[in-house]
Amino acid sequence: MILACDVGGTKTNVALLESRGGAFEIVRLETFQSREHDSLEEILAAFIGSGTLPLEAAGFGVAGPVIGGRAIITNLPWQIEALQLADRFRLPTVALLNDVEALAWAVDSLPDAEILTLQPGLSVVGNVAVVAAGTGLGVSALVRSAGITVSLASEGGHADFAARSNLEVDLLTFLRSRHGHVSVERVLSGPGLVSIHEFLRGSEGGDEPEWLVSGLRSGHPAAAIVRAAMNGSSQACARAVDLFLGIYGAEAGNWALRTLATGGVFLGGGIAAKLLVASSGASEAWRRRAIDLFLLGFLEKGRFRPMLERVPVRVILNDSAPLIGAARCAEIASAARR
């Protein structure tokens, strides 16, 4: 039995998984509101209870950088240490890793039913790039070399945003006036979509429907923008989503080139599901157009367009994939100790 956690600024998922023939089955899963707890240890104590569990290993995917066995969560006042968790809960092996790094470990375990293909490309064994846009932007990769596969830890979402057009240069100038340094995450995330909308509203003007104004003032403004774009009630929202999709595709293409991802690009995070799978109820025509805009940005790489045309592009549909990846990493770490 393996304990796995997906630790985020909003919620923390904790699960017990069993490994069966290379695949993982979730035996038990609980979700905790992260901000209602003072630490991960408090959540684990509530999950495990007063007894003990026959655990082979534990894997913790966390929303933040992991350095020297220690993680500081980006949007929580938590500090997590692998050795401390091992001692407190008597865990024989602990794998502490970034959440998107954990997501990358899950890629090889996902069946076809849990993946949506945007571009089939050519199926070859090679590096795999992972890009996950949600509350923030995370990137990772599965790197294959000399018969060995490893998942790459990265904070690439905080690298510089590179504008590709005059409109994006204006967006960059707008964001620089707010933030100084403009990372890709400032654009390619839920808050980034809101910023794009604010930029376009300021430059184009026009009235917004009252329900949208109310939605933008709520706790979920990005979701309100997506809804308005899908139902055609706001030109500014539609333009914001169009611009966002092109930038998303461009960054996925950049990461594919940086990692030589001949094995494919996998998209995670809630935004890919909302915009490219159209889980919010958009028409098939809207979804097809969204995919076309994404792929236009993805493929627009000059001399390397032919290479990117051969790269499969897929969306991860399984919300539990980060848990599966954390469990897989923990299992590998446990086997290495034997």
Q: What is the predicted function of each stretch?
A:
Residues 49-96, 101-114, 130, 264, ...:
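Short beta-strand-loop/turn "lid" adjacent to the catalytic site in phosphate-handling enzymes
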Residues 115-120, 124-185, 276, 286-308:
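Glycine-rich phosphate-binding loop of actin/hexokinase-like ATP-binding domains
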Residues 1-53, 170-338:
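ATP-binding/phosphotransfer module of carbohydrate and carboxylate kinases, centering on a glycine-rich
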Residues 6, 99, 134:
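Active-site glycine-centered loops adjacent to acidic/histidine catalytic or metal-binding residues
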Residues 90-92, 124-128, 261-262, 310-311:
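Short coil/turn connectors at secondary-structure junctions
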Residues 20-22, 111, 145-148:
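Short, surface-exposed beta-strand-loop junctions and turns on beta-sheet-rich folds
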